[in-house]
């Protein structure tokens, strides 16, 4: 199907929005304190509920602007200045997410005003910097479209096949041991032929193959 052809890898933050919240990253400039929260998000409603919790916790803060980018193709983008001058808060937060090519990600920045006005340019820089710090501190994963290649082999070929998989750094899932061994390899669509050829050579043509449907697999980012 067409859909399978167009799946593209994307980077996001690990995990659901945690019940206990996430630890914010603090950035201070000219006595204004900015607390940046970055979370994984796939649903606008869930983000709004989470935002209410952040605002409740920081009820003394004057502004809690936010931005979110949702969808594997980053096609849903929202931002709010939450009372800051137009374009000085939500927009730079959104740009910080986009600059890192991230999606399914929401960032809220709580600002405690320190009595010194930062000016429009100062606000834009401060919100962009705070959002960037929050995003950079968050644990991230790369959601990568891979296809399962099921490889059936006899037991006498297992050691050689496992050595090949290790050396080729192929991601695997559970192996099933029955009358024959079924290895599950997770491979980018473009590399399937290459690995099939190598395994066919290695097993002198005794390996049998079946392809599964392409799906997203989470690969942790260091």
Please describe what each predicted stretch is.
Residues 140-157, 183-185:
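Short glycine-/aliphatic-rich beta-strand segments at the starts of folded cytosolic domains
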Residues 5-87, 210-222:
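C-terminal regulatory domains involved in ligand/effector binding and gene-expression control
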Residues 89-137:
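Active-site beta-strand/loop microenvironment that shapes enzyme catalytic pockets
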Residues 185, 191-192:
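Terminal, non-globular segments
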Residues 162-167, 195-203:
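Short amphipathic alpha-helices in soluble, non-transmembrane regions
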Residues 103-107, 134-146, 159, 174-175:
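Short, structured loop/turn "capping" segments at alpha-beta junctions
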Residues 152-170:
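Short amphipathic alpha-helix segments
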Residues 172-177, 203-220:
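Conserved short beta-strand edge segments in small beta-sheet-based binding/regulatory domains
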């Amino acid at each position: 199907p067409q859909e399978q052809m167009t799946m593209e890898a994307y980077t996001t933050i690990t995990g659901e929005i945690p019940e206990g919240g996430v630890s914010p990253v603090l950035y201070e400039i000219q006595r204004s304190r900015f607390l940046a929260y970055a979370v994984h998000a796939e649903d606008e409603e869930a983000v709004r509920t989470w935002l209410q919790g952040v605002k409740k916790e920081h009820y003394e803060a004057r502004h809690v602007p936010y931005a979110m980018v949702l969808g594997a193709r980053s096609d849903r983008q929202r931002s709010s200045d939450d009372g800051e001058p137009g374009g000085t808060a939500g927009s730079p937060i959104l740009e910080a997410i986009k600059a890192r090519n991230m999606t399914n990600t929401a960032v809220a920045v709580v600002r405690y005003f320190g009595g010194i006005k930062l000016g429009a340019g100062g606000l834009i820089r401060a919100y962009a910097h705070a959002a960037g710090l929050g995003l950079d501190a968050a644990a991230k994963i790369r959601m990568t479209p891979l296809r399962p290649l099921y490889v059936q082999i006899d037991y006498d070929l297992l050691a050689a096949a496992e050595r090949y998989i290790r050396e080729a750094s192929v991601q695997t899932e559970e192996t099933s041991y029955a009358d024959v061994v079924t290895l599950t390899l997770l491979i980018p669509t473009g590399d399937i032929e290459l690995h099939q050829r190598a395994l066919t050579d290695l097993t002198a043509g005794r390996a049998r193959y079946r392809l599964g449907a392409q799906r997203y697999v989470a690969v942790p980012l260091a």
